Amino acid sequence: MNIEKYTERSRGFIQSAQSLAVREGHQQFSTLHVLKVLLDDNEGLAAGLIDRAGGNSRAILKATEDALNKVPKVSGGGAGQIYLAPELARTFDAAEKAGEKAGDSFVTVERLLLGLTLEKTSEAGTILSKGGVTPQNLNAAIEALRKGRTADSATAENAYDALKKYARDLTQAARDGKLDPVIGRDEEIRRTIQVLSRRTKNNPVLIGEPGVGKTAIAEGLALRIVNGDVPESLKDKKLLSLDLGALIAGAKYRGEFEERLKAVLQEVTGSEGTFILFIDEMHTLIGAGKGDGAMDASNLLKPALARGELHCIGATTLDEYQKHVEKDAALARRFQPIFVSEPSVEDTISILRGLKDKYEQHHGVRITDSALVASATLSNRYITDRFLPDKAIDLMDEAAARLKMQVDSKPEELDSMDREIIRLKIEQEALKKESDAGSKSRLQTLEKELVELEEKSASLTARWSAEKNKLSDAQKLKAELDGLRVELANAQRRGEFQKAGELAYGRIPELERQLADIEAKENSGEMMEEAVTANHIAQVVSRWTGVPVDKMLEGEKDKLLKMEDSLGKRVVGQAEAVHAVATAVRRSRAGLQDPNRPMGSFMFLGPTGVGKTELTKALAEYLFNDETAMVRLDMSEYMEKHSVSRLIGAPPGYVGYDEGGALTEAVRRRPYQVVLFDEIEKAHPDVFNVLLQVLDDGRLTDGQGRTVDFRNTLIIMTSNLGSEFLVNQPEGEDTSAVREQVMGMVRGHFRPEFLNRVDEIILFHRLQRSEMGRIVEIQFARLQKLLTDRKIVLTLDGAARDWLAAKGWDPAYGARPLKRVIQRYLQDPLAEMILAGDVKDGDNVAISSEGNVLTFNGKAPQTAEIAQFEAPASKRKLN
């Protein structure tokens, strides 16, 4: 016996058999050990051959194990020393001779099994013979497995049944009802069939964005082949999906991968056109399996593709096709591209309606039609970095999974009741130990309460169980119905019309009636939701994108008509600006503005401290329920020419290329927010060139070539240009003349093509003395909020409010001096009083003014004399 003449798998089995003999304490290494490890093999090569040869592999394995249990065991000093049984040596000789006779260079696993049958005097040979496995039958099974191939390498077994190992039969999956229905895509499927029907280069490649349904087209073709809805040239074909991962996995030695792929190609080409190979992610062929001097997978495919022997359908994305396949012109010319475009929202709704039954059956909940429409429309509007129908299907799937999880969990009402029962039982046990009258009285009351709660809990639990059972029964019926429909389709294909009639007019209608009865039973006051609605879809969108659900589902008219009132609570004295912003947003939301532009783009002009940035924060909070839903860029940081790359990311080859830009990354991660360009006039002119595309098309390409969507952002730019005209404007004077002066300065600084793209240029006027009181109240409310946790309540009377307003008013500096006044005269004394213990948690503090100081509960603060606050330039006008 020359072990080098055995294949790797044969050697592995011989070593495993030897280890088994040692482990069991047997003195002889016999044919029984070899047969046992051959039949224990996970891949089942030997077991499969025995079954093909007319034997029963399970019965033979049982007989082998029984025989091994009867073999004497050796323990003590002689244990571990084993000897080769003479019949096993003869078995190896017989296997080698059988291999040589068949033209093999190596002894394979099946020859080893054949050797066991040829050595009839051995125990294993006897078991196989009794099991009905003869050398003649086994030889015939081996020939059928090998299909004329000889074992020329140490990994020869990898080539057996290569398609079963490395490919998935899509046509069989279609027959078994394991494929989702394919709705639409008729044009692409027809074009694929057309290319497959060509004489040469009959290999289509489906090219499209991720998630548009390329793989679904291949599955649709498999369904059509099964249903006979294809030309004669494609009838009875088998569509096989190649698993490149399985081909590469475990290929340790050089040439092993090529051998596996070659075996697949030989089976496909040897079938004389019966098999069509589908290669998903086709670009992975390029370089797959390539090592030192080895050929990659694509080079092995080229000859068969060019001759038309190999029918192949590829699928890859546009980017990967351009990056990998187009560079290899010899491979690209052998494929005929078929471009798969993204379906429209209407087509997506049709696709979802076709898939609905499968998802209802899987999750065990109902999916309403409004949920399907919401999935398509909301995903199209709000999830911009992915493609239909994939993103819409994901929405529907996740919403159904979320509802199913809620259905399986205990309802909140029942859960809180059960927790209350546990709490009362603990109290009951504690009261039983007390002997006073009060405790006994409380115990009686508690026991009555406990009985009532337990009865109510039992009733609710019964209701909940009934509702769960109803859903479970419906799910089982749907699964059974699905199986019967697959059975009906197969019966019709096979021409078994009696069976088809029984199914179509008997069992299926009966199950449909039962299902309708279950779904018609409406429980009064259901404890849990049983159907996925548009609201559930909106909640999932909210979790994915950060858009508040209530804002999306609230009526647009009601929401937007309240806008001025809401913004006016935070921004004082700028009614014109608030109105201009509200009308622009209303115009955008009403669909009267180009949907491919941002929601709105505004330029706020005015002096410092009048509420430009505050209005931006108020907008973010109102539109997105979150003041932080805003990316703020201080344009004083973008004064140099090279700083433009910080906005959109460094170009390839520069440091920071992988990091992305400050603007593009912020919007890409959170597409729904306010974008604030503060002090826009300080930016370098090249920054405005970048913004032109954003303002006009609502999109921007970053340094890595990704398109970032700005259509759902609100763009605001603030500037102090012309503020001196606004500050010096006398109260009550017409603003049109001042506006012209300000706009003259703006036009002198910004280029016309930039200004022309801004929706509104809004003037903020200086704050009037009469408006300061409201600002004091807003600032005071924020201070009160800081003390909420301490339960300290502040009250501010009119005199104190007027005192603070007078101290903080400055026409040149707006409301910012007021913030400093409140900090100095209100917050600082309060902080010292809290630290000194004069004001404790839960106290009420009344703030008033006496003379030139504020009093706290009638007392002036016990601190060093507070210096008079001189508001800078209160009387001075800016030149």
Swiss-Prot record:
Region annotation (Repeat 2) ranges: 84-148
Protein name as it appears in the record: Chaperone protein ClpB
Annotated segments matching region Linker: 343-546
Free-text domain note: The Clp repeat (R) domain probably functions as a substrate-discriminating domain, recruiting aggregated proteins to the ClpB hexamer and/or stabilizing bound proteins. The NBD2 domain is responsible for oligomerization, whereas the NBD1 domain stabilizes the hexamer probably in an ATP-dependent manner. The movement of the coiled-coil domain is essential for ClpB ability to rescue proteins from an aggregated state, probably by pulling apart large aggregated proteins, which are bound between the coiled-coils motifs of adjacent ClpB subunits in the functional hexamer.
Coiled coil stretches, renumbered: 393-525
Region (NBD2): 556-766
GO BP terms, alphabetized: cellular response to heat; protein refolding
Subunit-level organization: Homohexamer. The oligomerization is ATP-dependent.
Gene3D superfamilies: 1.10.8.60, Clp, N-terminal domain (1.10.1780.10), P-loop containing nucleotide triphosphate hydrolases (3.40.50.300)
Similarity annotation: Belongs to the ClpA/ClpB family.
Record gene name: clpB
PROSITE patterns with a match to the protein in the record: CLP_R, CLPAB_1, CLPAB_2
Region spans: NBD1: 161-342
Location of region: Repeat 1: 6-71
Molecular functions (GO terms): ATP binding; ATP hydrolysis activity
Sequence positions that bind ATP 1: 208-215
Keyword vocabulary terms for this entry: ATP-binding, Chaperone, Coiled coil, Cytoplasm, Nucleotide-binding, Repeat, Stress response
Chain intervals for the UniProt region annotation (C-terminal): 767-879
